[in-house]
Amino acid sequence: MDTDNSTLPTEQSAVRETCDRDVTMSPRKRRRLSVSLEPELTEPEAAGTPGERCSTADTPESTASEPRSLFNSTPTEGNIAPFLTKHIKDQHASRNRFAPIDSSLPRRKADSKYCYRHRPDLKCRRQAAEPTVDQMQRDLSTLSQNDQQSIAHFWSLFSAAPSKHRNLMLQGIVAQCCFPQLSFLSASVRDLIRIDFVTALPPEISFKILSYLDTASLCSAAQVSHSWRALADDDVVWHRMCEQHIDRKCEKCGWGLPMLDRKRLKDTKRQVQLRAAGKEIAPNQRPQQQHRPWKAVYMDRFKVGTNWKYGRCTTTIFRGHTNGVMCLQFDDNILATGSYDATIKIWDIETGKEIRTLRGHESTIRCLQFDDTKLISGSLDRTIKVWNWRSGECISTYTGHQGGVLCLHFDSTTLASGSKDNTIKIWNFHDKSTRILRGHADWVNSVKLDTASRTVFSASDDLTVRIWDLDTGKCIHSYAGHVGQVQQVLPLPREFEFKHQSNCADDRSDRLSGSESPDHRGSHGYGSNNAPDQQPNTSAPPTEPMSPLFEALFTEDQGRPAPPRYMLTAALDLTLRLWEVHTGRCLRTFFGHIEGVWGLAADTLRFVSGAQDHMAKVWDPRTGTCERTFTGHRGPVTCVSLSDSRMATGSEDSEVRMYSFKA
């Protein structure tokens, strides 16, 4: 008996070696032989979850709190594969699973290498789904005891194996799968291979990733889960979105949104002025500190930007003048208009009602400008008048031009005016001094001051545009290129950016705007596709060499701020032109009007022009194309004005039309 027992292990070893060599043996025979040679398995011990064992180093000990799982079956010590005893010696040591943990046992090393989805420090660590485990348990219970033990043994081996061995085991299994099994495998892993990287990463990195998304993608991300929504709605992400789009064209998608409403800023400024004057402020008039989420700010601006893009607006018509309207200006609440009938009218924008009429000029009002405290007007009667537009009182009258005053522009200290006498007069409010700028050979139709650089721009019927030095009265440079009388010149904001080519042709944000609005024909206008617009000229040559005086005045050594980099002009040759100021080069010519252009307005997002052809056009500076054409006036459009959410046009038909693009 003792001899027979001593030879049994040798016989089993011989049979095992024979099985290893016999590669032609059928899988069923090999499985039967392997099962028959296995000693009876004992109750498996808990070995931790499989997600915590994908390592080439020692695994942590099991604790009494770990749930029992299908994957926790552990074979007896005598049946452990060599790689198991090499890599996880302590895991298969015989011990009571409910015994307290011995602190003297070896712990996992700090530099242990995990599969990236099984790292215990990651919140996205893979865990077996409870419904899946329950279903597998039920399916397993329908099998024979031997089959259950074999499958549990295989699962335990795979669960305890390091990453390299797991890959080899999987490769072998996949290589033996038939097509239905491969299809089952593909369907099973389709959802399992997804990972919630946003939850796993630090918030700073998640914010950085989300900041690269456009609006449509960001809104889609917010619908994934509660955690994604919390990150996608965060002020950090939407503040970055506002920086990219508000008051500028985004280089990625081409979208630009209007600036924020300035009403709150103006209210605060008004309170400061009242306090400085020693006046009491009622408690209900004091500005309250308010903080709007950046997402709400972007949402409001996006609605306005979409309305601009598709021409969705409401129109208010102001009637009251008895002759053509020649000039206008508006702010948040007030509209001021000047007419051939020698009057200036102040209107309430919200109600469309006339507030008061300013009378005093003896001829046509050709130009006006107002701020919070005063309104200054110029007339063909050769005078300039300063008004208190709130009371209607004329404060003072300036004379000096030998011809009618055609244009004016003022800042806090200086007034510039242009006249039929071919001159520009500079008036100083503080010391009452004046300076005359001579050089134009015909009427001066437009003047614009640039306070920072101490310069003034002018446009004339002599077909030229000039830039002047306010300190010396000298002409710095003359720009030639128009073939018709230049009616308007407009230095563009320093924030304006010009690019010859678009960086992004696909505008995914259009998906959020819904369907396009109906055509704005008749009183509203119509889309640019219906207008006889031509492609812009983007390769115009320089007009003439830059004046050495320009380079001498605006260098870093002088410390004098340079004028705005770009300016826009309009002329009776039917075109608008965009110029680079410091080189004198015409960058782009805008074609579309079929008669001369009289009115011009612009901001960083769009240009607006009014012409003899009874039409007003909105242009995209980025592409040079006409975005929309507005019709409805029965006479030439002589003047236009523009804000973030409104546009106004005045015409010789005595009407003013206000288009509001607010949501």
UniProtKB/Swiss-Prot annotation:
SUPFAM superfamilies: F-box domain (SSF81383), Quinoprotein alcohol dehydrogenase-like (SSF50998)
Ranges for region Disordered: 1-78, 502-547
UniProt KW keywords: Repeat, Transcription, Transcription regulation, Ubl conjugation pathway, WD repeat
Keyword DNA repair: no
Polar residues biased stretches: 1-15, 56-77, 526-541
Assembly behavior: Component of the SCF(sconB) E3 ubiquitin ligase complex.
Superkingdom classification of source: Eukaryota
Domain spans labelled F-box: 195-241
Organism, scientific name: Trichophyton verrucosum (strain HKI 0517)
Swiss-Prot/TrEMBL WD repeat ranges: 320-359, 361-399, 400-437, 439-480, 544-589, 592-629, 632-663
Name listed for the protein in its UniProt record: Probable E3 ubiquitin ligase complex SCF subunit sconB
Its job: Component of the SCF(sconB) E3 ubiquitin ligase complex involved in the regulation of sulfur metabolite repression, probably by mediating the inactivation or degradation of the metR transcription factor.
Bias (Basic and acidic residues) ranges: 502-522
Keyword Zinc attached: no
Annotated metabolic or biological route of this protein: Protein modification; protein ubiquitination
CDD domains linked to this entry: F-box_SpPof1-like, WD40
Originating gene: sconB
Family to which the UniProt record says this protein belongs: Belongs to the WD repeat MET30/SCONB/SCON-2 family.
GO biological process: protein ubiquitination
InterPro entries with a match to the protein in the record: F-box-like_dom_sf (IPR036047), F-box_dom (IPR001810), G-protein_beta_WD-40_rep (IPR020472), Quinoprotein_ADH-like_sf (IPR011047), SCF_subunit_WD-repeat (IPR051075), WD40/YVTN_repeat-like_dom_sf (IPR015943), WD40_repeat_CS (IPR019775), WD40_rpt (IPR001680)
A matching Pfam family: F-box-like
